[in-house]
């Protein structure tokens, strides 16, 4: 029984699904997808639970959310192992994900008060008030790269605001989704407030097609995000928050410390085996001897990165990708770039057949025409050279995406110029592209999405503002508008 609907664990009526460790092949989870009727059942449960949940005070809802945070803390080791084994990421990185889940809850609570709480302004004849109200029933689609942390970036603010939820984890991380849901169950969520439906494309299509849905919160690929946008087009009554991918540029201008710049680049491009939406995909390198020295050092250090199993000791920097298929897609992308004329500096290699252990790849594309503006979701870095900083900015903006952008340079003036001209939701200076703060917005423009699914800004799309003009008594104004006559004379 792997679906959680209206407070009960039930068996899915759809296709059977098996999840294996992407490195060892060990069977981790088995279950059945939710059928279309079960998706509708989850929606009815969420709709029925909404009025009571929304009418609870914020303090009452907050108690449940904080109880969940405590359960995350007490079950940290177990959840870390589940996420690591299912995604293939090393233990250390899965542990940072669970820590981020815990820390984000307190920030989400503070954000609700600051951004979407209640305000009152006194007026000469009354008061103006601002309140926020929940949308209703929301669908949350989770990604596989951070199967606990990123869905919770939607779920926690949505619950605090008073919404009820139908959560569909990625079909590649059903075990993590179930493990997190069981902690919510222990936290004491009333039946129907949060429902879990497992499944792939068919389940997702059934969920997004529900007429009685008030909104959809999505983190994942641009292709799926575009499909959801088309599916919900013509329905402005439904909130649609999309956090999608990026073809992110990292500009290496002047470098004072080559090793520090190489470390930043590796953290930007290869952490999580390149499976972060903010990862650097395009390295824009200033032409010249210093750029040559930097690139040679980057290749040398990257060559030492050997992916390993989640529990290897000593711990590896990167683990496997989410699946062997995902790893093979990266290799295929590299082969296509090489066939276009790219010069391979470091070839990505699958270490073992039937696993997802893939070494990083670096390929120079300077002077190659027609390179696709697509996100390769894995450890593959493409390199272009530039001559002037103005050219670097033009190259950085030459994408339909707009998620993250970074600059390595000692010159503040160049960063100020980039801040003015960059088309990206995240613009960093001498910091990895993959770094993020829950108190700052997280998201992009263009094909990278619309709203900002971090703890702080997620509050904005989880509730709608209600304005009120109020007075505790009704009196006739001392001064009337022209043409109004309230005298006692009878007009004949």
From Swiss-Prot:
Record protein name field: N-succinylglutamate 5-semialdehyde dehydrogenase
Gene that encodes the chain: astD
One Pfam family hit: Aldedh
PROSITE patterns in UniProt: ALDEHYDE_DEHYDR_CYS (PS00070), ALDEHYDE_DEHYDR_GLU (PS00687)
The organism's taxonomic lineage, starting at the top: Bacteria, Pseudomonadati, Pseudomonadota, Gammaproteobacteria, Enterobacterales
Main function: Catalyzes the NAD-dependent reduction of succinylglutamate semialdehyde into succinylglutamate.
Listed CDD domains: ALDH_SGSD_AstD
Keywords of the record: Arginine metabolism, NAD, Oxidoreductase
Catalysed reactions, semicolon-separated: N-succinyl-L-glutamate 5-semialdehyde + NAD(+) + H2O = N-succinyl-L-glutamate + NADH + 2 H(+)
Catalytic-site annotation from UniProt: 243, 277
Similarity comment: Belongs to the aldehyde dehydrogenase family. AstD subfamily.
